[in-house]
UniProtKB/Swiss-Prot annotation:
Gene Ontology CC terms: extracellular space; mitochondrial inner membrane; proton-transporting ATP synthase complex
Lineage start: Eukaryota, Metazoa, Ecdysozoa, Arthropoda, Hexapoda
InterPro entries in UniProt: ATP_synth_F1_esu_mt, ATP_synth_F1_esu_sf_mt
Phenotype of gene-disrupted mutants: Embryonic lethal. Heterozygotes show increased lifespan and enhanced resistance to oxidative stress. ATP levels are normal.
This protein's encoding gene: sun
The protein's name in its UniProt record: Protein stunted
Species this protein is from: Drosophila melanogaster
Length: 61
């Protein structure tokens, strides 16, 4: 059994923890570059009555 399964977490949770620890261990200059790559953007279009409503953009850093 893998360590992350034995700990009772999913692979995604394990991967996120490992990535966070790696980013925290970087030197200051490299840490800033890694933080820029960490941002994500999601476009979401809700539908009402069979037609798309106003598009929404979500940004997370």
């Amino acid at each position: 059994m893998t360590a992350w399964r034995a700990a009772g977490i999913t692979y995604i949770q394990y991967s996120n923890i490992a990535a966070r620890i790696l980013r925290e261990s970087l030197k200051t200059g490299l840490r800033a570059d890694a933080a820029k790559r960490d941002a994500s953007h999601v476009k979401f279009t809700p539908w009402a009555n069979g037609k798309p409503a106003q598009r929404q953009t979500q940004s997370e850093s």
